[in-house]
A protein has these predicted regions:
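A structural signal for short, well-ordered beta-strand segments and their strand-loop junctions
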Residues: 28, 73-74, 96-99
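Short, flexible loop/turn elements at secondary-structure junctions
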Residues: 2-5, 33, 77-78, 101-104
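Alpha/beta-hydrolase
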Residues: 85-178
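Loop/turn elements at helix/coil->beta-strand transitions in domains of secreted/extracellular proteins
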Residues: 22-26, 68-70, 92-95
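N-terminal cap/lid subdomain of alpha/beta-hydrolase-fold enzymes
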Residues: 1-51
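Glycine-rich nucleophile elbow surrounding the catalytic serine of serine-hydrolase chemistry
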Residues: 75-85
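Alpha/beta-hydrolase active-site loop
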Residues: 45-66
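Alpha/beta-hydrolase fold nucleophile elbow
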Residues: 67-77
Length: 178
């Protein structure tokens, strides 16, 4: 289950961790209202957790005829949320649910992330991470060409300027690491 757009899964070299480990087939489902799954006209009334669960239920029922063995639902971030919601609405559809990350936010400002980041790991590890982040920001003018070159070589594109991409990478590093 993908929580966002699924275009990257079209890459012939793409492999998802569980399907690789289990030598399993992969049915990759793009979340409604993202990329190619955006209807015209956009009627936001249909963008609900229940409808997304029904989407997965219908996909699973269709493919279960072809793939009758065990089923796993997995996802990261919004995909993790989708995995949990799918299990909540259709508890018997899949044999296993593996939400790698599934943040269920309490509101626009959740408040749980900061205390987590202040306690995770050891104090020395947290200090090393913060020192690294500060060092990268101090050397931003040197780091930016390296990031631009890397992104160009990997054909990565963004909707924001590259200096902002670097800022996000640095500021989100501790959260992404843990």
């Amino acid at each position: 289950t993908e929580g966002y757009g699924a275009a990257y899964a079209l890459n012939p070299k793409y492999q998802e961790e569980l399907s690789k480990l289990l030598n399993a087939n992969l049915v990759f489902v793009e979340y409604r209202y993202f990329l190619e799954s955006t209807p015209e006209p956009k009627n936001w009334d249909y963008l609900t957790a229940e409808n997304s669960a029904y989407d997965l239920h219908n996909v699973r029922n269709t493919f279960k005829q072809i793939y009758p063995e065990k089923w796993i639902s997995t996802g990261i971030s919004k995909g993790g949320q989708t995995t949990m919601l799918y299990r909540a609405f259709f508890p018997d559809d899949v044999d296993f649910s593996v939400p790698y990350v599934g943040p269920l936010c309490k509101g626009v400002e959740d408040g749980r992330h900061e205390p987590f980041l202040r306690k995770v790991g050891t104090k020395a590890e947290r200090e090393k991470i913060q020192d690294f982040q500060l060092e990268v920001l101090k050397r931003k003018s040197d780091m930016l060409p390296l990031l631009e070159s890397y992104c160009k070589n990997k054909n990565l594109t963004f909707r924001i300027p590259m200096p902002e991409v670097l800022d996000y990478c640095v500021l989100e590093y501790s959260f992404a690491l843990w």
